[in-house]
């Protein structure tokens, strides 16, 4: 009787360390839980794979934060062996590295602390997040949320169906919004901010010059430092004005001289 009790305790201890339930499951390291069919855990500790065809594995590459604004990716890449606390739930998902989470169908969280949730969602780099069908976050600290949303710039954010934030620190919010300039921001369905620190606010608003700003539906700012303010407004090249007529009265002798560098407000 004493020997039987000892055997039960030993069996329970083994089960607590590695749990495998289902057909063709493959737990490898300590404290992993693998359930259902054809799930694979390779070289990972404290891993969880639940569903069918999921893979939890170690990662030999990750990225650190940048020390300065335009530090190249090659300088921030680190090599090593990261392999604990990752989770894959659903069908054919992959979670790699440390504390990665992949949920849905064919989603991939490929580096430390990355999150991919949805059908074919991909979080490709460290601290990236992709949520939604075919959403993709492909840079460090990038976030893509929505159907086919894409965040491919460092610390970029794309939120909305087919929204795209493709440069460093860019933000695109709204269906088909596009922020492709460095530090660009596009808010609204179809809004576009394509140049350095350009800003577009409103449906189909467009800012296509450096430091340009478009505010209002279909507003269009196309000149350096210019502002298009109001629905359908556009900008023009800044020019020198020596006089102006107000309420029938002409005023002249202006000292200020306009220039393209100073921009215009329309």
Locate the predicted segments by residue.
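Periodic small-residue-enriched repeat registers in elongated scaffold domains
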Residues: 27-266
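Bacterial Sec-dependent N-terminal signal peptides
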Residues: 1-29
